[in-house]
Amino acid sequence: MERWWFNSMLFKKEFERRCGLNKSMGSLGPIENTSEDPNLKMKNIHSCSNVDYLFGVKDIWNFISDDTFLVSDRNGDSYSIYFDIENQIFEVDNDHSFLSELESSFSSYRNSSYLNNGFRGEDPYYNSYMSYMYDTQYSWNNHINSCIDNYLQSQICIDTSIISGSESYGDSYIYRAICSGESLNSSENEGSSRRTRTKGSDLTIRESSNDLEVTQKYKHLWVQCENCYGLNYKKFLKSKMNICEQCGYHLKMSSSDRIELLIDPGTWDPMDEDMVSLDPIEFHSEEEPYKDRIDSYQRKTGLTEAVQTGIGQLNGIPVAIGVMDFQFMGGSMGSVVGEKITRLIEHAANQNLPLIIVCASGGARMQEGSLSLMQMAKISSALYDYQLNKKLFYVSILTSPTTGGVTASFGMLGDIIIAEPNAYIAFAGKRVIEQTLNKTVPEGSQAAEYLFQKGLFDLIVPRNLLKSVLSELFKLHAFFPLNQKSSKIK
């Protein structure tokens, strides 16, 4: 009869790793939490700071191709962990009936003659380390037919690279559940089973209604990276300038955050804050009227329109600045956006101020028809007077995404054009081009790095350097901080 060898481990202490690892991942044993909170000993309180990774990616290849591990946490809850490297299967289960059978076999084998003949685990972190034989008639796949539930998801933060050998989290159930907000409710009272694919690997998740509620409850605390699909804690993301701490990708920023990044504290003076759209062409949609949609975005973002304009100081240098906000109807340019930017340019021309416009837009706003298209010409006309007649300095900053009418007008009219790393910059989007021309758009052909090589703009500047770069550019063009300017006049 065919038999299989398995490794089984029963940890002496709780299954525990902190997010900041304080032991080499080369060792498989549990790591003690030196800053343990006594409140965490309560059985029904879970914390992601309590447990982190089970294994590092490099550890997984130290095991044979078909392994099962038995682990126990500080609450006495046991879990079986099953690896099938050859078939790329990773499953975790806390099925009590199966675990009882496993522990029974484990205990019987521990007292067997094989163990008494001298086999001992060498790792001091294990209570025991052993191998035992198990008849395949019981079918391990049937016993371990469900994987980690949300309790372990919130504590272990499973790295899908264990399964796929890559650093991508894109198809992970855990990350989808936290970030997408998709409905995970089940008609079953006690829980349900969900199977997903992760880079060609089968992953079965056992869910419970309480776990799903926890997932939805804390979803708002995280922001998922568009590039690596890793999770970034929202509370810390702002201090990191909305740059992914895992891959360095520049995530979208609100207009208020950009103003805070560029403008000196206490110097911001907004303009035309009370200007709102009145639905000039009375655009009506069966799904949602235009005015209702405007109202919903105003409540959601706290803004009146898709751009903020005003006067402020950048390292002491007075500047006029307009910042578009993609969160407000995709940063689309309607009559109010066009009017606010035009007034900003005219005010900068009258006050002899350098001008900055931060672009983040999907283009002209279709709900306002040709009036939105006319904003392109109106803004370009105001810039013509500002740049050629007044001989003043305009810096255009292109962020992701900058497309459509904004790209075709003031986005590309800067005396200096700066792009953020990996910014998506185009006139027509990839999908529109492919559907119109029936041609495939090459991957990366609308990214900032590729367009920079083609000479489309002057600089690619990371966010952490942007303010200092702008300051040097203004000084180069004879715009100095107020205190330096007054001292030179004296």
From Swiss-Prot:
It is found in: Plastid, Chloroplast stroma. Its cofactor is Zn(2+). One of its GO terms (molecular function) is carboxyl- or carbamoyltransferase activity. RNA expressed in leaf, root, stem, and tuber; the least expression occurs in stems. RNA persists even in senescent leaves. Pathway: Lipid metabolism; malonyl-CoA biosynthesis; malonyl-CoA from acetyl-CoA: step 1/1. Residues 221-490 form the CoA carboxyltransferase N-terminal domain. Induction: Not induced by light. Its EC number is 2.1.3.15. Zn(2+) binds at residues 225, 228, 244, 247. Residues 184-203 are annotated as: Disordered. Keywords: ATP-binding, Chloroplast, Fatty acid biosynthesis, Fatty acid metabolism, Lipid biosynthesis, Lipid metabolism, Metal-binding, Nucleotide-binding, Plastid, Transferase, Zinc, Zinc-finger. Binds 1 zinc ion per subunit. It catalyses: N(6)-carboxybiotinyl-L-lysyl-[protein] + acetyl-CoA = N(6)-biotinyl-L-lysyl-[protein] + malonyl-CoA. Pfam families: Carboxyl_trans (PF01039). GO terms for biological process: fatty acid biosynthetic process; malonyl-CoA biosynthetic process. Its main location: plastid. A zinc finger (C4-type) spans 225-247. GO terms for cellular component: acetyl-CoA carboxylase complex; chloroplast stroma. Acetyl-CoA carboxylase is a heterohexamer composed of biotin carboxyl carrier protein, biotin carboxylase and 2 subunits each of ACCase subunit alpha and ACCase plastid-coded subunit beta (accD). PANTHER family: ACETYL-COENZYME A CARBOXYLASE CARBOXYL TRANSFERASE SUBUNIT BETA, CHLOROPLASTIC (PTHR42995:SF5). Belongs to the AccD/PCCB family. Component of the acetyl coenzyme A carboxylase (ACC) complex. Biotin carboxylase (BC) catalyzes the carboxylation of biotin on its carrier protein (BCCP) and then the CO(2) group is transferred by the transcarboxylase to acetyl-CoA to form malonyl-CoA. This is Acetyl-coenzyme A carboxylase carboxyl transferase subunit beta, chloroplastic. It comes from Solanum tuberosum.
